[in-house]
UniProtKB/Swiss-Prot annotation:
This is DNA-directed RNA polymerase subunit beta'. The lineage of its organism: Bacteria, Pseudomonadati, Pseudomonadota, Gammaproteobacteria, Oceanospirillales. It comes from Carsonella ruddii (strain PV). Binds 1 Mg(2+) ion per subunit. It comes from the Bacteria. The keyword Methyltransferase does not apply. The gene is rpoC. DNA-dependent RNA polymerase catalyzes the transcription of DNA into RNA using the four ribonucleoside triphosphates as substrates. The RNAP catalytic core consists of 2 alpha, 1 beta, 1 beta' and 1 omega subunit. When a sigma factor is associated with the core the holoenzyme is formed, which can initiate transcription. Mg(2+) binds at D434, D436, D438. GO terms for biological process: DNA-templated transcription. Zn(2+) binds at C746, C816, C823, C826. InterPro entries: DNA-dir_RpoC_beta_prime, DNA-dir_RpoC_beta_prime_bact, RNA_pol_asu, RNA_pol_N, RNA_pol_Rpb1_1, RNA_pol_Rpb1_3, RNA_pol_Rpb1_3_sf, RNA_pol_Rpb1_4.
Length: 1292
């Protein structure tokens, strides 16, 4: 039995002597009970002598003694004692031989197929030989006759002999000599694999022969129960049946050996015993598993511990609890934000023991079962007693699926006679609940600590701000928003002069809530406003310090609630929210807003538009036409929808719903009024025949059936993405659960360098900087403006902008160097409280929930978006904010005939300097700049001015154009330019010839060639272009699949080519491939081969740097971290994930993504082992590699070299320091086996492992006990000392 207080859990391999020391007796009989007297069989699987604490009076079958103590046996008495089975012939453990990386195979250096043949007596192994020709380990066919001077063995006994004869230390020395002499990479890999496994056994002290079993432990009966259903029927655990088969076969083998049966019969019986032991440990893995009479596979040890219904996940990580219930939810607008109504029947059941205690004290009832009868007779008394008791309790409500912490909140209890839970309408957004049959679970906290937590931490009014992005989550929605919008809408009626707020409210009530009145209100200045706007402004700003004379929409109300929260006005927010709720429901009821068929305006001349589309459809790209029509119709809809054509009202109901943000989107209205657009098939491919009809006028038969494809796809996607996003959340939780705030400051000296001028909008800058801390102090004119570790809030941010500070260094969780978890200063503010994060906050769990929760809103399909120009090339109007001199750096430019500088290299740097660098920008190919090197420019000057978003290819030299008119180009009409161009169908080559100089240009597919053959052109002239609307639609996997690809650090299917050296490019065309050669200035070169179907972003003669993207596709994360830097990886990773969420209007704060990336980048790979104890190719934690190098440096030895790697979240979770956490995630058997071989110890530092063993988690309120324990010795030091002592080798 496990002691209640323990600090760590260890796992080791068990030898036969260890199993014997656990055992309380040998099990010899296969029978469970004696069916005559229904007593357990002596020496059987339920023998009381072995498994019970009680001593029996006698062992007779027909025992009727009065002192028969096992008749009153309790479950606890058969709970913890272990027995054993002594095998008559050794058997191999299936987990050590049939796993993906067979341990026995690695140690003996024999393949799995050979081992299987040895076990099944098809081959025999030479154990000892006196013949020079035949050596040890030689294999022979079993039936072959061999001389007497050679000793051979077969079966599990042979493997046991081979494993016990291994001298691990000598094997290591031999293999090290082989490594030095090895020339082949494949041989080196196999030797390293072999030496790794041997070293693990050598350092751990485990003997390889223990993998072959002589004794098997028998679990206590409580873990494999036998339940009586009736007098002669019993339900037994599958483990009992498997034990029974093992015992029967073992007994049969023993009998056959004693009677000296023929050799072949003995062999067959040994094989059957081996198979039964395989089945006991892992029945599902066998080709012919043991089945029941109904042909069901019996559940073995493996199935008991692994999977969703195994011990780890069903019984340890998640448990069913008492004092809980569930029922349907309905809305109750008259509640306060912190209240909910519970049905009396549920409350009576939950509080039954408490009521029983009170009634028993008064001597009214004697047993708990009488409460129901007493309630029927004395309803009023029980309800009064219940109401008194309910006052001191707060109930916890939970709605599944619990994707984030806002799904679990506590409320004050009110009782109702209805049979549903009634909740406040404003908490629906937190729970993502509606009232179409949703159910909620009720939980009653009982202990004092649980009550305190539910009364304060979980209370709904303390969860107004979302921890994922810092935005308000308890906000007015739907009907309330619509009512407030209508209340503050300007109907442009005649205005009345009123100055006092009380007069305005009285006037509103006196006129039967007529709010369509304009008022001339005197607030410092006379304002012509509406009655509704004055009342809403009075709620937010009582003294009218500010006055917002606008229509109040959802976004504005959200910003105002966040504004009040920033200034610590929580009590004011709650009052305002309650008043907004009442006003919203009142006005939406009085207004009677609803939509009808006549609210859907008609777009005129649609017939002519469709006619034009029909003609153009066969000459142009269909995607471009739909995009043009989309923009065209949206403008018409916005203009026409605002005013109802009947003229009865001044507002359109549909427009109110859309503009207020209460319901609907422009996409839905476009489908109702204009056209439906593209639909996808069931496999995700887009049907290239868009629907130009709308839902108002109806669809024809063809379009109706095309619509059904999309509807089916939508339904299947919903079910798939729910499962996938749930799995993604689980993976994120598993990788980040041990990230908790344990320190105030880690004293790191590394962080992120941020160029304030590189952000084109203030919103972007605010989102990235707000809530971070400065790494170094900020100076201006040799005076410290801001000290280090200053929190960047609104004031600091505006000070930086005002003082024109260009570069700052900020702290990031990615560079936090805390021994355990993360420090407060690196994390910054807690977004849900708007204050510096407190010690004990489980930031890892919050990050995982923040990324995983909006996952269900993402799309599963492959969507079509802009390709080359929109993804890799940036263009925008840029205005300089400082006066200074122009300087170009690291770029190749040409000057066109208009005197404009055009960048023709992959990218270039542009700087404004005046003694020091004031501003720095990065421009990409094709950027036109008005100024040259050394020019003086003033602030607020427009630097670049793009009139269009097209992508152009420019000439770099003067000369004649030459190209062959082959099948690769076709003449095509361009709708945008109203001209005919040659369009490229494949990659195409254009040459510009000037005397002896030739320059080749490779034009990608789908570009329009602007020049003609034999044209004479100058530098900077356009050769070819890709119009923004007709950009090749590249299929980019969007939504969840792309998110999963990034977090798993998979190599993309279409991988971008990255330059590994600095140098000049030379491109050749060979067969169907490009041969790209990058020649360095030092003479060496690097050659790449790329398919001609891919797009190149470079031309002949371009100078590229390490890490430059040379072709289309997505870069590999491991290449980014090794070729460029971890800082670039951070910015790329954050931008990629935000680009997935942004189209769905979801914002996830950068720090959450950084925390996950921290976990993904904490490993290194050893490139050169030097004289350290590491092996080449080992994957270690970064801290372990640094510690190892320190110890080698102390001993004056050669250091090891390593490189940072990015590991996927699944792999990171499985390679966790805690084997408990890893085993409960997935691949349970493999992790437990590898951990046992290494003698691993789990120090229970994370949250999951503490939940598994039933302790308080080391986070939040559970952290106080851990701090008390740490006063004597630091657990961090212990952890790292133990990790340093151990030899951590990653299995291949």
């Amino acid at each position: 039995m496990i002691k209640s207080i323990f600090k760590k859990v260890s796992i080791k391999m068990a030898s036969s002597s260890k199993i014997l020391s656990w055992s309380f007796g040998e099990v010899t009989h296969s029978n469970f009970i004696n069916f005559k007297n229904l007593k357990p069989e002596p020496n059987g699987l339920f023998c009381l002598k072995i498994f019970s604490d009680f001593e029996l009076c006698c062992l007779k079958k027909k025992c009727f003694c009065h002192n028969d103590k096992f008749l009153n046996l309790k479950k606890a008495h058969t709970g913890y004692k272990v027995g054993h089975i002594k095998l008559f012939y050794p058997a191999v453990h299936i987990w050590y031989i049939k796993s993906s990386h067979s341990n026995i195979s690695n140690i003996l250096n024999l393949s799995y197929k050979i081992l299987e043949k040895i076990i099944n007596f098809k081959l025999k192994v030479v154990i000892k030989s006196y013949d020079i020709k035949i050596k040890k380990f030689n294999l022979f066919i079993f039936d072959k006759k061999i001389k007497n001077i050679i000793f051979t063995l077969s079966g599990a006994k042979a493997l046991k002999k081979l494993l016990s004869d291994r001298e691990l230390f000598i094997d290591c020395l031999i293999l090290k000599i082989k490594i030095k002499k090895c020339n082949s990479f494949s041989k080196l890999f196999s030797i390293l694999k072999h030496i790794n496994k041997i070293l693990i056994f050598y350092y751990s002290g485990n003997k390889p022969s223990w993998m072959v079993l002589k004794k098997i432990p028998v679990l206590p009966p409580r873990m494999r129960p036998l339940i009586a259903l009736s007098e002669k029927k019993f339900a037994s655990s599958d483990i009992n049946e498997l034990y029974k088969i093992v015992l029967e076969r073992n007994y049969k083998l023993k009998k056959m050996t004693t009677y000296l049966d023929p050799k072949q019969l003995l062999i067959n019986e040994r094989i059957s015993l081996q198979e039964s032991i395989y089945a006991l440990f892992d029945n599902e893995k066998l080709i012919n598993p043991i089945l029941t009479s109904s042909k069901r596979v019996l559940k073995s040890f493996s199935s008991l511990i692994k999977g969703k219904y195994g011990r780890f996940r069903q019984n340890l990580l998640g448990k069913r609890v008492d004092f809980s219930g569930r029922t349907v939810i309905t809305v109750e607008p008259n509640l306060f934000l912190y209240e909910c109504k519970i049905p009396i029947y549920i409350a009576l059941e939950l509080f039954k023991p408490i009521l029983y205690y009170e009634l028993k004290k008064k001597k009214i009832i004697t047993t708990i079962s009488f409460i129901d009868d007493y309630y029927k007779k004395n309803k009023k008394q029980i309800i009064l007693l219940l109401k008194n008791k309910v006052k001191s309790y707060f109930i916890m409500l939970n709605r599944a699926p619990t994707l984030h912490r806002m799904n679990f909140q506590s409320f004050k209890i009110l009782l109702t006679e209805d049979k549903t839970i009634k909740i406040h309408p404003l908490v629906c957004l937190c729970y993502n609940a509606d009232f179409d049959g949703d159910q909620m679970a009720i939980h009653l906290p009982l202990t004092n600590n649980a009550k305190v937590e539910s009364n304060y931490l979980l209370l709904s009014i303390n969860n107004i701000i979302s921890p994922s992005n810092g935005n308000a989550i308890i906000i007015p929605t739907q009907d309330i928003i619509m009512g407030i919008y209508y209340f503050t809408f300007d109907f442009k009626n005649k205005s009345i002069s009123l100055n006092d707020i009380n007069d305005i409210i009285n006037f509103f009530e006196f006129n039967n809530y007529n709010f369509q009145i304009n008022i001339k209100f005197n607030n410092k200045k006379k304002i012509n406003t509406t009655l509704g706007r004055i009342i809403i402004n009075y709620l937010f700003f009582k003294n009218f310090d500010y006055f917002l004379n606008i229509v109040f929409k959802k976004k504005i109300l959200t910003y105002l609630i966040k504004y009040l929260f920033d200034f610590n006005q929580l009590s004011k927010i709650i009052i305002i929210l309650e008043k907004l709720k009442k006003i919203g429901f009142l006005i939406s009821t009085y207004s009677g807003i609803t939509i009808s068929y006549f609210d859907l305006i008609e777009v005129k001349n649609t017939f002519l538009i469709n006619k034009v589309v029909f003609k153009l459809k066969y000459n142009n790209n269909i995607f471009s036409i739909v995009e043009l029509l989309n923009n065209f119709f949206v403008k018409i809809i916005i203009k026409k929808i605002q005013i109802n054509k009947t003229g009865l009202k001044k507002t359109n109901n549909l427009f109110i719903m859309l503009d207020s943000g209460s319901r609907g989107s422009m996409l839905q209205i476009k489908q109702l009024i204009a056209f439906r657009g593209f639909f996808s098939k069931s496999n995700g491919d887009i049907i290239k025949d868009p629907i130009f009809d709308n839902l108002k006028n109806g669809l024809n038969m063809k379009n109706y059936f095309i619509s059904t494809f999309g509807a089916r796809k939508g339904l299947t996607d919903t079910s798939l993405k729910t499962a996938n996003s749930g799995y993604l959340t689980r993976k994120l939780i598993d990788v980040s659960h041990d990230l908790v705030i344990y320190k105030i400051d880690c004293k790191t000296k590394t962080g992120i360098k941020i160029f304030l001028n590189s952000y084109f909008t203030l919103v972007e800058l605010y989102k990235n900087l707000y809530g971070r801390l400065l790494l170094f102090s900020v100076s201006l004119k040799n005076k410290i403006l801001l000290k280090e570790n200053t929190l960047i809030d609104n004031k600091v941010l505006f000070l930086l902008i005002k003082k024109k500070i260009n570069t700052i260094f900020v702290r990031s969780v990615l560079f936090c160097i805390s021994n355990r978890g993360v420090c407060c200063f690196c994390y910054g503010i807690d977004l849900s409280t708007n204050k510096i994060v407190l010690i004990g906050v489980s930031v890892g769990i919050i990050s995982a929930q923040s990324i995983g929760e909006p996952g269900t809103q993402l799309t599963m399909r492959t969507f079509h978006t802009g390709g080359v120009a929109s993804y890799f090339f940036y263009s925008d109007n840029l205005i300089i904010s400082n006066s200074g001199f122009v300087k170009f750096k690291k770029c190749k430019c040409v000057i066109n005939k208009f005197g404009e500088v055009i960048i023709v290299s992959l990218y270039g740097e542009f700087m404004i300097f005046n003694k020091i660098i004031l501003e720095k920008y990065k421009f990409y190919y094709g950027t036109k700049i008005k100024f040259r090197n050394g020019f003086l420019i003033k602030k607020n000057t427009k630097l670049i001015n793009f009139n269009d978003n097209n992508f152009y290819i420019y000439s770099e030299n003067i000369g004649y154009v030459y190209f062959k008119k082959e099948n690769n180009i076709v003449k095509n009409y361009c709708l945008e330019d109203n001209k005919f161009y040659y369009k490229t169908l494949k990659n195409f080559k254009i040459t510009i010839i000037n005397k002896s100089i030739k320059k080749n240009y490779f034009i990608p597919k789908n570009f329009n060639i602007v020049v003609y053959c034999y044209d004479y052109i100058f530098p900077g002239e356009i050769i070819a272009k890709l119009v923004s609307v007709t950009i090749l639609k590249s299929s980019i996997i969007g939504g969840l699949p792309r998110l999963s690809e990034l977090f798993e650090a998979r190599i993309p299917k279409l991988k971008a080519l990255l330059s590994e050296i600095d140098g000049v490019c030379k491109i050749k065309f060979s067969h169907l491939n490009y041969i790209i050669t990058i020649i360095s200035k030092f003479g060496f070169y690097k050659e790449y081969t790329l398919s001609c179907l891919r797009k190149l972003y470079i031309n002949n003669g371009d100078y590229v740097k390490i890490g430059d993207i040379l072709s289309d596709g997505k870069p590999d994360l491991n290449e980014i971290i090794n070729l460029i830097s971890i800082n670039y990886l951070l910015s790329y990773f954050v931008n990629e994930i935000n680009s997935i969420y942004f189209p769905q209007n979801i914002y996830v704060n950068c720090k959450h993504i950084e925390l996950i990336l921290k976990q993904m980048t904490k490993k290194v790979k050893i490139i050169f082992s030097g004289e350290s104890s590491c092996q080449q190719g080992d994957i270690l934690f970064l801290e372990d590699a640094i510690n190892e190098n320190f110890s080698t440096l102390v001993n004056s030895r050669r250091l090891s070299y390593y490189k940072r790697i990015v590991t996927g979240i699944t792999k990171t979770s499985l390679e966790s320091l805690s084997f408990f956490s890893a085993a409960s995630f997935q691949e349970t058997n493999k992790i437990l086996v590898n951990s046992a071989i290494k003698n691993r110890t789990d120090y229970l530092l994370g949250l999951k492992e503490n939940v598994l063993v039933g302790r308080l988690i080391p986070a939040g309120t559970g952290l106080i006990k851990y701090f008390k324990k740490k006063s004597k010795s630091s657990k961090n030091n212990l952890d790292f000392k133990n990790r340093k002592k151990k030899f951590y080798i990653n299995y291949f």
